[in-house]
Amino acid sequence: MNIQRKKRHYWLRGLGLSLLLIGSLQLWCAWQVYRFSQPKNDLPQADAAVVLGAAAWGNRPSPVFRERINHALTLYQMGYVRKLIFTGGTPKSGYETEAEVARNFALKQGIPEQDILIEMRSKNTYQNLVNTRFLMQKHHLRDIVIISDPLHIARAMAIAEDLDIKANYSPTPTSRYHNASWQTQAAFFIQESYALFIYHLLHFGRSISKIII
């Protein structure tokens, strides 16, 4: 009977510790999302600005995507970066990729074609940055500035760090989420905090499996 009690005691302690660790990680992820979303007083310099993909409406960038592109153009025009990298594939064949839509938008704003790089195969943030790393190596770019919506930055920076990409960040100063209702803002904050939490869990799992194997 004592053995059974001890087993249950250790099991409950293990469960309690696991829940504590999971809760702590969730709180830490929420803090990271909040911290990285805050406006930056200084604009970072780098070899290139990377615009993470977002929805394209036909051959036009969605409002969210357009704000990301415009912020990258501002950094380029002010001399903070010398190259622009646009990322993103397409959900359906026969449509322009997100990267192509962004490139065409930038060309219409007078950006020289030789200063634009694109990758057109990615479907998510992780693939955006994996393919960006390849472009950096191919074109001898040392560092980048990641551009996305404020609440998306924390996850993008975590991925960049895991991929050994030397990166800074610059959240878009304007976004549809800034003018959204508090319910919409809260929902997006929770969504991004959860996405970052899941990413760290999966990354930890992959790291453990490599050690075991």
Predicted features along the sequence, with ranges:
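N-terminal membrane-anchoring alpha-helices
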Residues: 1-47, 209, 213
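A structural signal for short, hydrophobic/glycine-enriched beta-strand patches
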Residues: 29-189
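A transmembrane-helix-recognition feature enriched in membrane-embedded lipid enzymes
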Residues: 31, 182-212
